[in-house]
Swiss-Prot record:
Binding locations of GTP: R26, R75, T106, K167, R269, L270, R271
Reaction it catalyzes: GTP + AH2 + S-adenosyl-L-methionine = (8S)-3',8-cyclo-7,8-dihydroguanosine 5'-triphosphate + 5'-deoxyadenosine + L-methionine + A + H(+)
Protein name: GTP 3',8-cyclase
BP terms from Gene Ontology: Mo-molybdopterin cofactor biosynthetic process
Source species: Tolumonas auensis (strain DSM 9187 / NBRC 110442 / TA 4)
A single GO molecular function term of this UniProt record: cyclic pyranopterin monophosphate synthase activity
UniProtKB keywords: 4Fe-4S, GTP-binding, Iron, Iron-sulfur, Lyase, Metal-binding, Molybdenum cofactor biosynthesis, Nucleotide-binding, S-adenosyl-L-methionine
Upper taxonomic lineage: Bacteria, Pseudomonadati, Pseudomonadota, Gammaproteobacteria, Aeromonadales
Domain of life (superkingdom): Bacteria
Residues that bind [4Fe-4S] cluster 1: C33, C37, C40
EC numbers for this chain: 4.1.99.22
Amino acid sequence: MHWPPEFGKVFMILEDGFSRRFHYLRLSVTEACNFRCTYCLPDGYRPDGRKSFLTVDEIRRVVYGFAELGVKKIRLTGGEPSMRRDLPAIIETVANTAGIEKVAMTTNGYRLKDRAQQWFDAGLRSLNVSIDSLDPRQFQLITGENKLVEILEGLEAAQKAGFRKIKVNTVLLKNLNDHELSQFLFWLKKQPIQLRLIELMQTGEMDARFQKHHQSGLPVKTRLLREGWTQQNRNLTDGPAEVFSHPDYQGQIGLIMPYSKDFCTNCNRLRVSSVGKLHLCLFGEEGVPLRDLLQADEQNSELQSRILEGLTHKRETHFLHDGDSGVTPHLASIGG
C-alpha cells in the first residue's frame, strides 16, 4: 500500500507477482478497421453483430478506475480508433480524468489529415501512425489501401496541429519491406519522429504468414550500432522498444523485438479490449470481464478489486518461443 498526499487515502498500486508495476493502459475502443493489412486482417474486418463496443460512460469509468490504481498513460487503440464517430468525446473524457498525464493513440492515419487538429484540441498529445512502406505500391500491397500520400500529408497536418510526439509503426516483413531500411533512414534525416520497427508476431490466424514473413530485428540493431546509433535509456511509461538516436538524424529508431531475450522483464502495460475485457498479455488468456462493473460509478471499488485479483494471474513471460501465441486470433481483437 502507498499513500500519495494528493489522494489523502490508501492508494493501491498495480503490481504483479514479479514486482512489475503497471502505469500504462492500452484501451481498445473498436475492433473495426478499414484497412486489410496482411499481418492483421488480410480479409478485412468482419463485424460480429453480437458485439457492442464500450460506450463513452463505460470508458470514463474504466479509465477512472485504472487511474486511481496508478495508471498515468492511456493509449487508445483498435481496430482503427477513428472509425468511432464519438472519438473526440472519448479523447476528451480520458484526457480530463484525474491522474492521467498522457493520452496517446495508434492509428492507420486514414483520417489524420482532416482530424489531427480536432483530436489535439480534445486532449490527444501523442500519435503512433502505421506506415509499413514508403513505396506507394508496396504500401497498397501490405495494407490493401492506396493511401500512403494522404497519410504522409496527415503527418504534416499533425505536426502543424501541435503534436510533438509522433511515432511511425512499421512491421518488419521479410520479402515485403525488409529491403526498405535505407529508405526509411534517409527519411528520418529530416523527420523529427521515432520510427518503430516491430517484429511480426505470431497469432492464432496468422501461422502461415508468420512463417513466411517473420524478420528478426537483430540484424537491424547490428547495423544501427555499426553506423553510430546509440541506445537510449527507458522512461517509466515507455513501451518495450529499444530506442536509438544518431547526431546526424532528427528522428529516432525504436526496435520492438518480442522474440528477444528478457522482452517481458520490463512489461509495464495492461490491455482492455473494446468489449471490456482485461487482458494481462497480448499473447495470453481469454481475458477478465470488467464490463458488468462499468454500469455505475458506485461500482468503482468492486471494479478495482477485480482488476487487482486478475493481475495475480499475470505470467512472467509469453511463450512465443514455444509457438504458443495464446488465444488471440488477430491483433485487432484486443488492440495490439
